[in-house]
Amino acid sequence: MADETKKEQIGSVILDLSRYSGEDLYCDGEVEDRILEIAKNYPEEEFDAIIRDSKDWPTLYHLSSIRGNIVGWIPFDGSEKVLEIGAGPGAITGVLTERCGSVDCVDLSRKRSLINAYRHRNCSNLTIHVGNFEDIEPELDRDYDYVFLIGVLEYAGSYLHSSDPFGQELRTILSHVKPGGRVVIAIENRIGLKYWAGCAEDHSGRYFGGIESYSAKEEPAKTFTRPALERLLLENGVREYAFYYPYPDYKFTSVLFSDRRLPEAGELNENIRNFDRDRLLLFDEKKAYQGITQDGLYPLFANSFEVVVGPALPVDYCKFSNDRAPEYRIRTEMDLVGGKVRKYPQTKAAGEHVLRMAESAMALSARYAVSSTGEGHPKLPEMGGKPSEKSGETEETVAAAKPRTLNIAPCTLTKDGGVEFPYVGGRSLESLLDESLQAGDGERFLSLLNEYRIRVGQGSLQQISDYDMTFSNLLIQGDLWTAIDCEWAVPRSIPVEELLFRSLLVYYLEDGKRSERCEELIGNERLLKAVGIPEKDAQRLAREEQDFQKHVTGGVVSLGEFRAQMGTQVIKPAQLQTEEEKNAAKELLKQEHEEKQELNSIQVYYDTGRGFSEEESYWVGEQYQEEGLVTFTVTVPEEAQRLRVDPAICPCVVLIRNARINEAEQKAVRRLVRVNGRHYTNGSIVYTTMDPSMEWDLKKLRRKAGIPEGEDFDLELTLQMAGLPSTMAQAMEDRR
């Protein structure tokens, strides 16, 4: 029985400390203090901006709403009683409290539990138990609908005293699930493809740590291959389970695949996601996935697993549109058994956007129904391509395929605030185009574009168009073409040439190799002619696409862009680099050196009574040398009233090593300097600004040096400077 005197209440959340030892044995240190302050003082709606400004791994990992995707696809009905083991700062908890009836959390750390409590303080259905799971477990209920172990099972050996910690964990958890309930486990794959390609093992930070079967004596966690995880389930009495594959991994899921809906190679292009540390690049994962998916090996090499123990769920695939403005964030689910595709808003603001799809589908269906009768469709000019000999097409077979219509997948509203489409089989136009490029069949590629132009262009006099009629949104079965997404329909007629050009542009942007292959096989000039877009219009349409993407994203930085901003490196060994890559690396080093030289340049300003200005300034020719030392001389004109020296164009630490006026050492130079940084007792000046400066009142300096007014003089300075990383400078500024 829990001690009622050892409970705290934060808002509506109960914090049960009756089994807390009084010490947090697991902590990220000072960063958790900062995250706790964020949870106390900022609403979740502001977390994205805080993450963007912080540019550090712990803030991203603990506060990103994308973390919740790993459970966000589960079809809760709102009545569920759930248990979350290892809840930490609550990255997953928010989704559970919002969509379930009651939530019990367990975590070892009081500080992390406080973060969880403060960020969800308005949730009256949340109780957090703080302490070791072994101590808390006997008092937990045994009728949960769901128990979640998200990134937890691999640590069982560190918090369970057992010769079989993983089996013991599973058996214990199963005893707390009611009949018909489920256990959900998310965990890394010990031999996930990213580890072969050069990512360090997630927990130990060692390269190939998991691949080498955790040969090191001290490993903080141990993950499993798919066969080993299945064996663990079977050995502990589990017979009903399903494997899902979060991509790129379970931490930041953008797509969820399953054994009933495995990925195609073209869907696996988010592979550079090393937020927390540098990685090697030993091969191109996307290319490796081509053979892996074709040979049915993806379940063995997926980076993560999500296992649902218990009755099957009616979801076989889920895609999250994360990198968007809140009003456009949605998820798309497939139920292959039920033959349904559903779309749901991920935010309250996106509700209207989703509901609008049903109306758009009706309008588009009406357009193409009219076009199938031949009405409202002007004759299109011929394309630049001919029927493909390699594909076996002839003028006669193409003509025999008419009428060449476009089917619009019907869309209906659901009772739970989403929309529903019938599942449509077939192959995407995108995959058929890829197949043509891989086969070296440029004529077939052009023939498919021609077919797009004919079918999508029908009914063009109607005032409705689907702006996002991209190749991936068109599914083909024999002669039946079906558009499966009407999310971005607009109430106006868009020329089919512009829709085709945009689709081709999106196709290229998703994989740069496609444009290179098209140039080799077809040539850009012929391709643009075939699409029907002049060069000047192509430039305009490319700008319009950029504007559209800015509108959709609303300034949200994608995870790929954010990783680049964080500064973690992707290192390709020299032996694996092509000559082109080596030359590019040399050019980059040269550019970085020039930029560094520019940042370390010294600028001198004089104030002759009109204030400091660029007109009365110059760049010092001398550069910082070994140990960051430089000596230079400033000739101060007689009319100058003030002097300013900018030692760099970046945050830095500066020390005035020596100062001489007219060849005589002058200590007054150090005493009289005014800076926009901070003086330290050792004489150094720390600047956290990008525009550091040192300034002297020349009237005072002349008087101290015994130089008459109206006389010029030489000031020789020896400075020592070390640049500061912007993140370090910001941290120092925050502590002032």
Give short role names for the model-derived ranges.
Residues 214, 463-516:
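Catalytic activation segment of kinase domains across protein kinase-like and atypical kinase folds
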Residues 407-449:
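Conserved structural core of kinase catalytic domains
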